[in-house]
């Protein structure tokens, strides 16, 4: 499978090579070398017949009619307000972006704070659940040990499963021995411990 993928990728590259040779013209950036080419042309030009035998020198004295046709406007008032408007718009856009970034940073800080609070609450809930299950386990283990001691204290009785006659039921039920009653009972009632069955979480 891996060899198959490699061969497909290699085949694609091999098929793309002819497309590069069929390109119409290569793209060359001559912006840096443009001045060097001009200098080389000056040196390569023939010295026998120069292009301009008599160079034309412009005279500073022009006729008035020709001078009126060429008006020079050096104020360029149309450029300045446009630049100012662009500067103002970019400044206002930048200010809006900065405000939005600050608002987003505040929201992120608030969300991080909420996340920390929720993580703390979750940790407390987990601790409460662990405490609840440990308490439940200790109660169950205490009740199972007390049930075992009660079963060990009972006398062994022979119970036959075959008949349900009243004689066998009387024999199967444990006998409670009561001593002579000389008055009120000497045993003190044990206090009742209130146990909450609600989930502490």
Curated annotation (Swiss-Prot):
Biased composition (Polar residues): 64-78, 143-167
Residues spanning the membrane: none
Organism: Legionella pneumophila
Annotated protein name in UniProt: Uncharacterized protein in pal 3'region
Origin superkingdom: Bacteria
Renumbered residue ranges of the record's region Disordered: 46-80, 143-201
Annotated signal sequence range: none
One example of a Gene Ontology biological process annotation: protein trimerization
């Amino acid at each position: 499978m891996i060899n198959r993928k490699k061969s497909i990728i290699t085949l694609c590259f091999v098929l793309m090579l002819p497309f590069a040779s069929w390109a119409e013209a290569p793209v060359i950036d001559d912006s840096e070398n443009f001045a060097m080419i001009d200098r080389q042309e000056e040196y390569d030009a023939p010295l026998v017949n120069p292009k301009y035998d008599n160079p034309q020198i412009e005279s500073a004295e022009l006729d008035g009619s020709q001078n009126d046709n060429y008006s020079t406007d050096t104020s360029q008032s149309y450029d300045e307000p446009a630049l100012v408007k662009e500067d103002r718009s970019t400044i206002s856009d930048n200010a809006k972006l900065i405000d939005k970034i600050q608002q987003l940073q505040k929201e992120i800080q608030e969300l991080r704070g909420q996340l920390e609070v929720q993580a703390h609450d979750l940790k407390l809930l987990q601790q409460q659940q662990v405490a609840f299950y440990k308490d439940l386990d200790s109660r169950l283990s205490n009740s199972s040990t007390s049930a075992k001691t009660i079963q060990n204290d009972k006398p062994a009785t022979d119970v036959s499963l075959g008949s349900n006659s009243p004689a066998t039921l009387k024999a199967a039920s444990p006998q409670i021995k009561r001593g002579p009653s000389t008055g009120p009972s000497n045993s003190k009632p044990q206090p009742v411990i209130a146990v909450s069955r609600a989930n502490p979480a």
